[in-house]
Amino acid sequence: MNIVLMGLPGAGKGTQADRIVEKYGTPHISTGDMFRAAIQEGTELGVKAKSFMDQGALVPDEVTIGIVRERLSKSDCDNGFLLDGFPRTVPQAEALDQLLADMGRKIEHVLNIQVEKEELIARLTGRRICKVCGTSYHLLFNPPQVEGKCDKDGGELYQRADDNPDTVTNRLEVNMNQTAPLLAFYDSKEVLVNINGQKDIKDVFKDLDVILQGNGQ
């Protein structure tokens, strides 16, 4: 099965991707992993991508698509794949459709994990880190035994600048604006399935699993 996994930051994509991989053995392919592998292998496209990344510039779509093509052509993807972080735009989605068509394949499911904005903000702003040892906590999911203190060494816990509510809210709004056209594109293709990501982790996976087994709409 050929899957695209979508969801805003904090929606739990990584957790659910791990569960899909564990059950189905489908390779989890993220944009970052693809770039790192291509660069490490020293492929022509990897060298090109590195030149843009070293300058702090966006990697052009044609290079990104080429790297995706190389990755999806590997034998571990013969029975399917789980794409995470790609495509990000409608032109990328159209290019992905074309390259898959050239391979006699197509996207079967686009799974979009939906979580309310307020819940995402709570999830993303709850992280706290020890100033002494760097241990990470979460006020909702993994709180310290003593508020504001590290369990290991009693060090002061702090919130990273990019975890503050204003920064998180802005990041979410940017992501929402970017993904809206892509969601509409896949909805028009009748492959988009919205999943309620506010449930317990196990229940979210149950809903995903129903779709992957072909028993859901």
Swiss-Prot record:
Organism of origin: Sporosarcina globispora
GO cellular component, one term: cytoplasm
Gene3D superfamilies reported in the protein's UniProt record: P-loop containing nucleotide triphosphate hydrolases
Annotated region described as LID, given as residue ranges: 126-163
Gene designation: adk
Subcellular location: Cytoplasm
UniProt xrefs under PROSITE patterns: ADENYLATE_KINASE
Protein name: Adenylate kinase
Sequence positions that bind AMP: 31, 36, 57-59, 85-88, 92, 160, 171
